[in-house]
C-alpha cells in the first residue's frame, strides 16, 4: 500500500491521491487504507518516510566510500540522474506541494530529507577534517544547504535543464577549488588556515563591538 501511494503521487499528483486511487494502485480494497492508517494524511506520511528510507539505504554504502568533495558531487550527480529517470524527482515535487495542505506530510517530508542530510553530513565531516577548512566549516549546515540545493535543482531542471546543468558545473568548480587547496604543501596550508582564522575573527570582533 505504501508503494501504491508513492506510485499514485508520482504518476497522478497530490490532487488525485485518494483511498480509491491508492487502493487501485496497490490492488487492495480501499477500506484497508483506513483500517491500517486511519486517514489519508497518515498514509501519505508513512509512504513519504518509507520512500525516503528506501532511497537513502540504496546509496548509503556508496556515500560511505566517498573521500573527497568531488567524489560527493559525482555521486550526487548520479543520484540526481537516476532518481529523475525513476520518477522520484516528480515525487519530491508532489510531496513538497502536498506539505502545504496536508498537515502530516510536512513533518514527514522534512524527516525524509533529514535522512539524506545525516548521510551527507557524515561525508562532509570525513572529507573536510583533513583540509584547512575542517575547523571552520559547519558540516551540518553545509549538508542542509547541499540537500536543499539538489532538491531545488531537481525541480528547477524541469523548467530549465541547461541552467540546472550549469549550476551543477559551478558546484564542481567549487569542489575543484577545495581540492586544489587541499593539495597545497604544509606551509601553504598553514598560511591558508591563518588567513581563515583572521577572516573568521573579524566578524566576531565587529559583533562584540556592536553589542
What is the role of each PLM region?
Residues 203-211:
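C-terminal regulatory/effector modules of DNA-binding transcriptional regulators
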Amino acid at each position: 500500500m505504501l508503494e501504491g501511494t508513492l506510485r499514485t503521487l508520482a504518476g497522478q499528483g497530490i490532487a488525485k491521491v485518494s483511498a480509491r486511487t491508492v487502493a487501485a494502485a496497490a490492488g487492495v480494497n480501499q477500506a484497508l487504507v483506513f483500517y491500517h492508517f486511519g486517514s489519508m494524511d497518515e498514509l501519505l506520511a508513512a509512504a513519504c518516510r518509507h520512500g525516503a528510507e528506501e532511497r537513502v539505504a540504496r546509496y548509503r554504502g556508496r556515500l560511505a566510500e566517498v573521500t573527497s568533495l568531488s567524489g560527493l558531487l559525482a555521486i550526487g550527480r548520479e543520484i540526481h540522474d537516476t532518481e529523475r529517470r525513476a520518477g522520484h524527482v516528480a515525487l519530491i515535487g508532489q510531496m513538497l506541494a502536498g506539505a502545504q495542505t496536508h498537515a502530516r506530510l510536512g513533518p514527514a517530508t522534512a524527516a525524509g530529507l533529514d535522512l539524506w542530510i545525516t548521510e551527507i553530513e557524515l561525508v562532509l565531516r570525513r572529507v573536510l577534517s583533513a583540509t584547512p577548512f575542517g575547523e571552520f566549516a559547519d558540516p551540518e549546515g553545509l549538508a542542509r544547504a547541499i540537500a536543499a540545493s539538489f532538491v531545488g535543482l531537481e525541480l528547477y531542471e524541469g523548467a530549465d535543464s541547461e541552467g540546472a546543468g550549469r549550476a551543477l558545473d559551478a558546484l564542481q568548480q567549487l569542489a575543484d577549488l577545495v581540492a586544489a587547496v587541499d593539495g597545497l604543501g604544509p606551509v601553504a596550508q598553514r598560511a591558508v588556515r591563518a588567513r581563515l582564522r583572521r577572516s573568521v575573527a573579524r566578524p566576531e570582533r565587529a559583533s562584540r563591538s556592536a553589542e
